[in-house]
Every structure is written in structure tokens, then in C-alpha cells.
A protein has these predicted regions:
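Single conserved hydrophobic/aromatic residue that forms the stacking wall/gate
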Residues: 1-5, 9-10, 214
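Structural preference for long, well-ordered alpha-helical segments in enzyme cores
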Residues: 20, 36, 40-41, 54-62, ...
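The cytosolic transmitter module of two-component sensor histidine kinases
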Residues: 34, 51, 89, 93, ...
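A short, well-structured catalytic beta-strand-centered motif of the EAL phosphodiesterase domain
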Residues: 6-38, 58
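C-terminal helical cap(s) of enzyme catalytic domains, especially alpha/beta-barrels
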Residues: 207, 223-246
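Nucleotide second-messenger and two-component phosphorelay signaling modules
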Residues: 27, 64-71, 99-103, 131, ...
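The catalytic core of metal-dependent phosphodiesterases that act on cyclic dinucleotides
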Residues: 94-169, 184, 188-222
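Catalytic core of bacterial c-di-GMP phosphodiesterases, primarily the EAL and HD-GYP domains
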Residues: 14-19, 46-122, 196
Length: 246
């Protein structure tokens, strides 16, 4: 298994965060996407072990960066639906964080919109994560069937707009929908991240909406860890030469 640095969230031409992804490296060096191997972990009951592995690896890498004096920013980790049902997940993740003596602001937790459907316990779990110092992100918003009312019940810190919503840009009705979704989120005090941004047109429209962060192939594809570190080291220099954000 190979931990991969994800697409970057970028605000004002600076990297302000990242998302940790996992890829399975085969013997020939090629990679399997999560869609091919995650179902296997879910089927054999090992998905929570995988989630914990990713969380621990991100903590370890963040500790390395901190000791090296590098600029720190939050890295988000996905939590599967199955892991949410483990009663000790908050204590377990808090304990791992303490092992690496990290500030909780450098590790964020992503929960997919689909995981919140028909799950009355999620709201309580989010509050427990907050008490432990974690920021909790609602991932893939707009891709599932959860009610807008859930945003009032479940106190997420960040709303990540699914790529399917971003692809509406260029369509009048779609842009109107995006406008009111972002206004609602901002009124509720949520930070907003637009996912799957691929074109200059999308970047320009999203900035008109005063969206906080942008994530997508327009800035960078998901990068292996070493390439991500190199990208970060050159990012400041590159941003001085050419602004990535209009």
C-alpha cells in the first residue's frame, strides 16, 4: 500500500491543506484505484484497520515535517462509514494523535455525505470529535441524498462541494444552485471547499462565490508523497512568478 498526497486546497495561490489518499501498488509498479480494492477491505471487515493505518501514517508524516521546521498545514483523512460504528474511534484517534504529540488542527477528518444518511448517531459523534479538538469535514456534498436540514443537526466545520456540483458551472440553473448552496453554507458559518475543479472557468466562478478553498486537477493531480513534498517546496517560488488563482 502506498500513501499518496492528494489534490491541494489552494487559497490566494498558497497551499493551505491536503487530503491523504491511499493507492495499492501492484508488483509491476502500477496502481489500483480505491474503487477496486476498498470494496475488498469492506467485505472482509478490514476497512477500519485501513482507516487507522492512513490516520497513523499522516500523523507520523506531520510529526516529521514539524520536527524539520517545515510550514505546517492541515491534512485531511477520510473515515469510512464502517469505522463510524466503532464506539471507541474518537478515543483511539485522539490517542494516536497524542502519541505523535501533534496539535489536532493539523489533522482533519472527512465523513462522506452518504455516511450521514439515516444515521442519528453521527451528530453525537461529530461533537465528540470536536471535543477532542478535531475539525470535521462533510465530503462529497451534493452527491448523495441527505437533507439540507442535516446541516443544522450535524455541526460540520467544512462543506466540500462534490465535483458533480462544480460541473454545473456554465449552466445557468446549475450556477444558481451553487450560488445558494454556498450562501447557505456561509450563513451557517461553514468553510467551503470546491472539489474536482478542472478549468479556469470553474476557478473564476468559484472565486466570485467567495468560496474559501479550491481542490482539483486545475492545480495538481494527486501526487505521491515525495512529489507532493517537492511541489510544496517550489510552490511559493512558482506562485510569485504566476498567480494560480484569479
Amino acid at each position: 500500500l502506498s500513501l499518496v498526497g492528494s489534490e491541494m486546497c489552494i487559497r490566494d495561490s498558497t497551499v493551505v491543506g491536503a487530503e491523504a489518499l491511499i493507492r495499492w501498488r501492484k508488483e509491476d509498479g502500477s496502481l489500483w484505484s480505491p474503487g477496486k480494492f476498498i470494496p475488498l477491505f469492506e467485505k472482509n471487515g478490514m476497512i477500519s484497520t485501513l482507516d487507522e493505518y492512513i490516520f497513523r501514517e499522516v500523523c507520523r508524516q506531520q510529526e516529521v515535517w514539524e520536527k524539520e521546521g517545515k510550514k505546517m498545514f492541515p491534512v485531511s483523512v477520510n473515515i469510512s462509514r464502517a469505522s463510524l460504528y466503532f464506539g471507541d474511534i474518537v478515543d483511539k484517534y485522539k490517542g494516536i494523535l497524542e502519541q505523535y504529540t501533534l496539535d489536532s488542527r493539523y489533522i482533519e477528518l472527512e465523513i462522506t455525505e452518504s455516511a450521514t444518511i439515516n444515521n442519528s448517531e453521527i451528530a453525537s459523534l461529530i461533537e465528540k470529535f470536536h471535543e477532542a479538538g478535531f475539525h470535521v469535514l462533510l465530503d462529497d456534498f451534493g452527491n448523495g441524498y441527505s437533507s439540507l436540514a442535516s446541516l443544522n443537526v450535524m455541526h460540520f466545520d467544512t462543506l466540500k462541494l462534490d465535483k458533480s456540483l462544480i460541473d454545473y458551472i456554465g449552466d445557468k440553473n446549475g450556477e444558481t444552485l451553487l450560488y445558494y448552496i454556498t450562501r447557505l453554507a456561509q450563513t451557517l458559518g461553514l468553510t467551503i471547499t470546491a472539489e474536482g475543479v478542472e478549468t479556469k472557468e470553474q476557478v473564476e466562478f468559484i472565486h466570485k462565490l467567495q468560496c474559501t478553498d479550491i481542490q482539483g486537477f486545475y492545480f495538481s493531480k494527486p501526487l505521491p508523497l515525495l512529489e507532493f513534498i517537492e511541489f510544496i517546496s517550489h510552490q511559493k517560488e512558482d506562485s510569485q512568478q504566476e498567480s494560480l488563482v484569479m
